[in-house]
C-alpha cells in the first residue's frame, strides 16, 4: 500500500480530466490522476474511439481517439502520475486541511485539492436478456466498436434504434459483408439526417432493416456465433446468419463512492459554484458532465472551460496567499512539469 502526496488529485482521466492536468500545470499545481479504466480517455476511448467529434474548436472533425491522444500529449509536459484500474473509494479530511483519497487498490493520496472530472461515473452497457449471452461476449457479442476494421467482411447484426445503432450501421456498411439492423419499431430515435441516410442504404441493399423485431436468442457453439434469432411482438421468429452481434441499448452509469461524499448532489450531479467550480466542501471542485449549475451545457467544450476554471481555483488552495499572475499561453509558453 503506497502513500502519495501531491497538490491536486484529479478523479477521472477523460478529456476534461486530461485538460485539467494541463491547466493545473500551467498554474504550477502538480497532479495525480485516478481512473477506474486501464487507460486515459474515459468514454471516448472505451466506447467510441473511432467515432468523429464535430464540435471541438479548430477541428471540423476529429476522431475521439485522436482527441484523447492530443490531450494526453498536451498534459505530458507536466508529468502527471496516473493510477489506472482503481477508484477513489474514500475521501476524508486530514488535520492539516488536506484531503486523503483512499484508493480501492489500497494506496492513498494526500492533496490540498481534489478535482472531480468523472463524467457520469463508472459505466457499463445495458445487456440484452438472452440465454447463453455470456459465452459469446468478447468473441461474437460486443457492446462497442474499437476498430471498424475488426468487422471487415463479417455479417453484423446491430440491435437498437438510437444514434449509436444507426451511426454504426452506416459506418460498418462500408466494411462489413452484411449489416442487419434489428429494431422493435419502424421508427428510429436517431438524428433525422442519420435516419435518412440509413434508409437510403436500406433501399440500395447495403443495409437490411429487420423491423419490427427484437432479439430473441443466439445460436453457435464454443463461443463462435453463427446466428441471431429475432422475434416479433406476436412471437414470430426468424434466424439471421451472423458473425457478430452489436447490442446498442445504451449505458447504465453509477457514481459509486462519489455519491457518498456529501458534496451537494443534485439528481446524481454535483452542484458547483459556476464562478469557481467549487463544491460544498472546501478544496473540492468538479468539472465536466458530472457537475451542474444554472445554464450548464453538457459539451466537451464546456468541460474544457470548467477545467481551466477549477485549475485556477485549485491554485488558491495549493498556494494560499500567492498571487496568480495571469498570462496567455502565447506569452508564458508551457512551463516544465
From Swiss-Prot:
Its EC number is 1.18.1.2. It catalyses: 2 reduced [2Fe-2S]-[ferredoxin] + NADP(+) + H(+) = 2 oxidized [2Fe-2S]-[ferredoxin] + NADPH. Binds 1 FAD per subunit. Keywords: FAD, Flavoprotein, NADP, Oxidoreductase. It holds the Pfam family Pyr_redox_2. GO terms for molecular function: ferredoxin-NADP+ reductase activity; flavin adenine dinucleotide binding; NADP binding. SUPFAM superfamilies: FAD/NAD(P)-binding domain. Its cofactor is FAD. It is an enzyme of class 1 (oxidoreductase). FAD binds at residues 35, 43, 48, 88, 123, 289, 330. Belongs to the ferredoxin--NADP reductase type 2 family. PANTHER family: THIOREDOXIN REDUCTASE 1-RELATED-RELATED. Homodimer. This is Ferredoxin--NADP reductase. It comes from Paramagnetospirillum magneticum (strain ATCC 700264 / AMB-1).
Amino acid at each position: 500500500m503506497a502513500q502519495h502526496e501531491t497538490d491536486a488529485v484529479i478523479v477521472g482521466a477523460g478529456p476534461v480530466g486530461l485538460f485539467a492536468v494541463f491547466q493545473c500545470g500551467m498554474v504550477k499545481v502538480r497532479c495525480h490522476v485516478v481512473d477506474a479504466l486501464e487507460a486515459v480517455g474515459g468514454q471516448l476511448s472505451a466506447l467510441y474511439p473511432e467515432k468523429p467529434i464535430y464540435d471541438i474548436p479548430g477541428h471540423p472533425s476529429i476522431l475521439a481517439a485522436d482527441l484523447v491522444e492530443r490531450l494526453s500529449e498536451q498534459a505530458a509536459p507536466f508529468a502527471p502520475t496516473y493510477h489506472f484500474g482503481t477508484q477513489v473509494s474514500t475521501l476524508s479530511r486530514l488535520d492539516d486541511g488536506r484531503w486523503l483519497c483512499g484508493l480501492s487498490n489500497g494506496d492513498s493520496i494526500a492533496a490540498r485539492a481534489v478535482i472531480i472530472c468523472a463524467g457520469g461515473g463508472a459505466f457499463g452497457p445495458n445487456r440484452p436478456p438472452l440465454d447463453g449471452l455470456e459465452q459469446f461476449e468478447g468473441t461474437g457479442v460486443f457492446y462497442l466498436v474499437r476498430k471498424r476494421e475488426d468487422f471487415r467482411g463479417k455479417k453484423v447484426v446491430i440491435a437498437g434504434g438510437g444514434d449509436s445503432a444507426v451511426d454504426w450501421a452506416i459506418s460498418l456498411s462500408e466494411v462489413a459483408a452484411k449489416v442487419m439492423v434489428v429494431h422493435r419499431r419502424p421508427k428510429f430515435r436517431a438524428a433525422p439526417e442519420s435516419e435518412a441516410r440509413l434508409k437510403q442504404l436500406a433501399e440500395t441493399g447495403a443495409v437490411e432493416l429487420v423491423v419490427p423485431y427484437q432479439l430473441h436468442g443466439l445460436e453457435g457453439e464454443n463461443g463462435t456465433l453463427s446466428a441471431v434469432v429475432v422475434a416479433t411482438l406476436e412471437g414470430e421468429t426468424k434466424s439471421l446468419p451472423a458473425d457478430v452481434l452489436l447490442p446498442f441499448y445504451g449505458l447504465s452509469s453509477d457514481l459509486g463512492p462519489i455519491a457518498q461524499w456529501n458534496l451537494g448532489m443534485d439528481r446524481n450531479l454535483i452542484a458547483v459554484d459556476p464562478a469557481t467550480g467549487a463544491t460544498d466542501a472546501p478544496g473540492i471542485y468538479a468539472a465536466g458532465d458530472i457537475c451542474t449549475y444554472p445554464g450548464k451545457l453538457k459539451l466537451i467544450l464546456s468541460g474544457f472551460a470548467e477545467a481551466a476554471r477549477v485549475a485556477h481555483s485549485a491554485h488558491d488552495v495549493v498556494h494560499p496567499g500567492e498571487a496568480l499572475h495571469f498570462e496567455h499561453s502565447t506569452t508564458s509558453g508551457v512551463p516544465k512539469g
